[in-house]
């Protein structure tokens, strides 16, 4: 099995994990509903890339056989908190003004257990450090008090139903365990949905092993295209 990481681009929705491509919990204000979630997510990605820069990465998995192709197995999104109005619904917010927010790592179920959440978070941290960002924050789901019989996989991304009216149990939120393993510390306390922070230029996590040239390669240094304003650039 081979795993390849790449920054999101604007030349096809195959670049995003399937559930990530249609989930807009973080990208819309609390209580807002989307008539076309896939389109809204695409426009969000285009807008953020045009105004701020790279805002996501995808992990592609293949079996290594020639001609077998690869699949978008996991995707992560990150940006300044103003681009994630859905974060206002989180009880341990708001996100600090000097930090960017990782909204979630969406992992396709067959690929859970490959530590894609960890490696994608490390990729975001590397990119944030490269851009001189002070800190990265994320909201976590604390499953320590989960009722017996309930089950949320590590990379749970709310496939059951998009939450309404303050019900966050179906929200796409990272596991608190993953964030703690990645060196994040609680900055906003809450029994169920604490907010975590990682100040940058600290010790690398167990999964971090990116050289500068390798990171530049996965960032796809070619010029970005956009359809904002009805024109390609």
Model feature map: region roles:
Residues 27-66:
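Active-site rim helix/loop that mediates acceptor-substrate recognition in acyltransferases
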Residues 58-60, 77, 195-199:
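Short, well-ordered beta-strand micro-motif
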Residues 171-232:
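C-terminal "cap" of GNAT-fold acetyltransferases
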Residues 102, 136-138:
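Conserved hydrophobic beta-strand within the GNAT/NAT acetyltransferase core sheet
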Residues 1-30:
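Conserved N-terminal entry element of GNAT/NAT acetyltransferase domains
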Residues 130-134, 141-189:
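Conserved active-site alpha-helix within GNAT-family acetyltransferase domains
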Residues 46-51, 65-105, 147-153, 159, ...:
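Conserved acyl-donor/pantetheine-binding loop and adjacent beta-alpha core of acyl/acetyltransferases
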Residues 107, 112-129, 137:
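Conserved acetyl-CoA-binding loop-helix of GNAT-fold acetyltransferases
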């Amino acid at each position: 099995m081979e795993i390849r990481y790449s920054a999101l681009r604007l030349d096809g929705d195959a670049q995003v994990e399937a559930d990530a491509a249609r989930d807009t919990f973080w990208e819309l204000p609390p209580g807002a509903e989307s008539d076309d979630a896939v389109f809204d997510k695409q426009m969000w990605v285009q807008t953020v890339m045009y105004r701020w820069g790279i805002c996501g990465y995808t992990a592609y998995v293949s079996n290594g056989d020639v001609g077998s192709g690869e699949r978008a197995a996991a995707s992560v999104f990150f940006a300044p908190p103003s681009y994630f109005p859905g974060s206002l619904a989180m009880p341990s917010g708001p996100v600090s003004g000097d930090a960017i927010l990782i909204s979630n790592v969406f992992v396709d179920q067959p690929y859970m257990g490959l530590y894609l959440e960890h490696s994608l978070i490390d990729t975001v941290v590397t990119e944030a450090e490269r851009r001189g960002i002070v800190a990265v924050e994320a909201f976590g789901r604390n499953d320590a008090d989960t009722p017996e019989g309930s089950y949320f996989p590590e990379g749970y991304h709310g496939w059951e139903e998009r939450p309404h009216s303050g019900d966050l149990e179906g929200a796409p939120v990272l596991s608190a365990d993953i964030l703690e393993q990645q060196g994040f510390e609680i900055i906003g306390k809450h029994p169920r949905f604490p907010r975590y922070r990682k100040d940058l230029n600290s010790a690398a996590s167990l999964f971090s092993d990116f050289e500068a040239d390798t990171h530049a390669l996965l960032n796809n240094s070619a010029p970005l295209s956009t359809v904002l304003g009805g024109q390609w650039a």
